[in-house]
């Protein structure tokens, strides 16, 4: 979900994804509505969807240039060895969000990612947070990008990227 909300285009939750339905949708049966009240199963996913919607609304970088090439830049799209993608989203105002997604079942420690600017980047989303039912692998809320060029960008940061998770970093200066 963290990847879909940060990537260009609009989001689509289909038939129970927001409650963690494990069965494929079928026109022959209804949704598993009991998952809504199952804190252990669906509670974390519901909290994540609420946070994703709030972050999306509050970060113009994620929506203001959805149909413009100037609103998106790949950081890394070819790291098949680590099963990761990283990209940037931009708003005309200067608002910038970096999204790093790990599709592997293992965390990546010290994973270097290029960023356009040095300074403080706040970790505004970590889908592996314990509040969503994850393991809590993260970056303690913020990272400091240093003047180490990486991925063709002027700065970079070393991250803890959670397993099967997404991390969003928002530039704060």
Q: Could you describe each region identified by the protein language model?
A:
Residues 3-13, 17-173:
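Carbohydrate-interacting/catalytic domains
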